[in-house]
């Protein structure tokens, strides 16, 4: 006869309690995530070094006292932000101040001195070919020295550098005496340099072997006597852009780092006078962008020059403009392009005039960040005196009138062995900005950098805690599901074991005849309080 089993499985009470505890934990977690952070904020405010917030964020309801403290804190915070914004705007304007100072030194480097005779060509040195080629440049008619028009002779192409070198005033003939700091000097101490005035000469132009002076005052610098050779000046037939109506020399005092730009920066010295030039060295320091507009020494140098200077920049601009318009360069311009011939002079003058009219729009020359210049004070006395005119006349075999019309004395010296420093400085730098903001922060809200770190640390902890509480329920649900699956597996295994055991016992009873064929014993319920399963069987 078939046997029917009716089985009821009941889990232990502790499993029910564990499930209840898990539900309770979930409810408490939800309550914790929904609870306001008043207590946490109050705890942070009581421990923070930020002034005032410990009176605002307190446990309990918001009262009048907390409201007044909140208003005071907001007003202080607004004032701090206003002052901090003003400081930031002032810093972004990049202001600077100029500091003037004077420093003494036991010795000073003597400046370079460039001199040029205002007359560029000696009339006695010109050949018929020179006069023919230089007609457009000098204004002289294309005639030979006898006043006749040249025949059909073919003159060779002119070499302007050779013409300047050959027909210019020679220093050996002009220099009558030379003295530097009590020691004699000569024309060999000068170097040839070409300018808009032709062949010129520079004293102490080599910066590697520059001369120094150890005393200030007259007689401790350069003193030279020159003969300007006025009788050899070119006759003026008509005025051109290159002719000059003056007599004398042009002088420029400059540093060894810059080329002479004597036609614009030089000063004139006339014959018949002794000119005293008292110099004061000035060392200027400018600020680069964004505080100033100077050119840093780290930037690319101008081709042909070792050091950047305004004079070198201007010469470079003139060279590029003449090359663009006339496809040549003048003798004094740097480069290796072809030198312009006298027939190109009109084109050159036009190009330079256009460059000058542009007022620096096409060629902007920045001021170098480090610059040396020389302030000058000039004074003059007439020479020769009546007593010295006769002596000089006999000494140089010239007439007294010639000496009055051609001789001059130039005396250049330092006023004192000191120099001025004119330096641009940042009026408001990063250190000043941080100091002002820190002072305003401490004055209005009593905070510091560490206070800001406290606030950031609190915000980090709050965000971290919120994220952990949002992710914790998911982990708890997953863990609970795994526990239920494990419990179900254990119950199934126990049930199978019990079925197998009961089947073996009933088979053994049938074989022994211990119970009736129609009635089986009915087992009572057994309640167990430990981690075991209770069951009922009915047939």
UniProtKB/Swiss-Prot annotation:
Q: What keywords were assigned to this record?
A: Cell membrane, Disulfide bond, Glycoprotein, Ion channel, Ion transport, Membrane, Sodium, Sodium channel, Sodium transport, Transmembrane, Transmembrane helix, Transport
What the record says about family reads: Belongs to the amiloride-sensitive sodium channel (TC 1.A.6) family. ASIC4 subfamily.
* Cystine pairs: 116-200, 178-185, 294-369, 313-365, 317-363, 326-347, 328-340
User: What does the entry report regarding how activity is regulated?
Assistant: Inhibited by the diuretic drug amiloride.
Q: Position of motif GAS motif?
A: 446-448
Q: Subunit notes for this chain?
A: Homotrimer. Heterotrimer; with other ASIC proteins producing functional channels.
Query: Which parts of the sequence are annotated with region: Disordered?
Result: 474-494
Transmembrane ranges, per UniProt, are: 69-89, 433-453
- Substrates-to-products reaction catalysed: Na(+)(in) = Na(+)(out)
Q: Which Pfam families match?
A: ASC
- Where does the record say this protein resides? Cell membrane
Glyco sites are at 136, 165, 179, 184, 206, 241, 370
An MF annotation (GO) of this entry: monoatomic cation channel activity
Q: What is this protein called?
A: Acid-sensing ion channel 4-A
User: What is the role of this chain?
Assistant: Could form pH-gated trimeric sodium channels and function as a postsynaptic excitatory receptors in the nervous system.
Q: Name one GO cellular component term.
A: plasma membrane
Show which residues sit on the Cytoplasmic side of the membrane: 1-68, 454-539
InterPro entries associated with the record: ENaC, ENaC_CS
How would you summarize where this protein is expressed among tissues? Answer: Expressed in central nervous system.
Q: Which gene encodes it?
A: asic4a
PROSITE patterns xref list: ASC
Q: Which GO terms describe its biological process?
A: sodium ion transmembrane transport
> Could you tell me which residue ranges are on the Extracellular side of the membrane?
90-432
Q: How does it sit in the membrane?
A: Multi-pass membrane protein
């Amino acid at each position: 006869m078939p046997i029917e089993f009716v089985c009821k499985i009941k889990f232990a009470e502790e499993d029910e309690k564990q499930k209840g505890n898990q539900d309770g934990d979930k409810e408490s977690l939800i309550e914790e995530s929904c609870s306001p952070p008043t207590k946490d904020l109050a705890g942070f405010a009581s421990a923070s070094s930020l002034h005032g917030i410990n009176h605002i964020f307190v446990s309990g309801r918001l009262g009048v006292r907390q409201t007044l403290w909140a208003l005071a804190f907001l007003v202080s915070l607004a004032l701090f932000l206003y002052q901090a914004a003003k400081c930031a705007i002032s810093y972004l304007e990049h202001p600077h101040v100029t500091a003037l100072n004077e420093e003494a030194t036991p010795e000073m480097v003597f400046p370079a001195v460039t001199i040029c005779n205002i007359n560029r060509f000696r009339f006695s040195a010109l050949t018929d070919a020179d006069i023919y080629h230089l007609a457009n440049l000098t204004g002289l008619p294309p005639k030979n020295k006898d006043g006749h028009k040249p025949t059909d002779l073919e003159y060779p192409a002119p070499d302007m550098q050779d013409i300047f070198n050959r027909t210019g005033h020679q220093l050996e003939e002009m220099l009558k005496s030379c003295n530097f700091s009590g020691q004699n000097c000569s024309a060999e101490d000068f170097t040839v340099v070409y300018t808009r005035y032709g062949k010129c000469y520079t004293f102490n132009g080599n910066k590697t072997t520059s001369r120094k002076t150890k005393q200030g005052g007259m007689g401790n610098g350069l003193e030279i006597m020159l003969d300007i050779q006025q009788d050899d000046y070119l006759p003026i037939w008509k005025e051109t852009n290159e002719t000059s109506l003056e007599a004398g020399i042009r002088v420029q005092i400059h540093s060894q780092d810059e080329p002479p730009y004597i036609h614009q920066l030089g000063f004139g010295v006339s014959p018949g006078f002794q000119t005293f030039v008292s110099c004061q060295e000035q060392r200027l320091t400018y600020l680069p962008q964004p505080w100033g507009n100077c050119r840093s020494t780290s930037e690319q140098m101008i081709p042909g020059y070792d050091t950047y200077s305004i004079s070198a920049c201007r010469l470079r601009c003139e060279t590029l403009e003449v090359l663009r318009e006339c496809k040549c360069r003048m003798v004094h311009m740097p480069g290796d392009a072809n030198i312009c011939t006298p027939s190109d002079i009109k084109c050159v003058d036009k190009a330079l005039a256009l460059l000058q009219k542009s007022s620096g729009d096409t060629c902007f020359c920045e001021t170098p960040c480090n610059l040396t210049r020389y302030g000058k004070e000039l004074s003059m006395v007439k020479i020769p005196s009546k007593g010295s005119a006769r002596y000089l006349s006999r000494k140089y075999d010239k007439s007294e009138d010639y000496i009055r019309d051609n001789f001059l004395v130039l005396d250049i010296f330092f006023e004192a062995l000191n120099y001025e420093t004119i330096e641009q400085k940042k009026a408001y730098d990063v250190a000043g900005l941080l100091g002002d903001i820190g002072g305003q922060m401490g004055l209005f809200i009593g905070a510091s950098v560490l206070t800001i770190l406290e606030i950031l640390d609190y915000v980090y902890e709050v965000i971290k805690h919120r994220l952990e509480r949002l992710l914790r329920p998911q982990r708890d649900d997953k863990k609970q599901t795994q526990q239920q699956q494990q419990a179900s597996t254990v119950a199934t295994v126990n049930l199978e074991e019990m079925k197998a055991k009961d089947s073996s016992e009933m088979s053994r009873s049938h074989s022994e005849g211990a119970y009736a064929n129609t009635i089986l014993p009915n087992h009572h319920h057994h309640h167990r309080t430990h981690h075991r399963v209770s069951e009922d069987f009915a047939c």
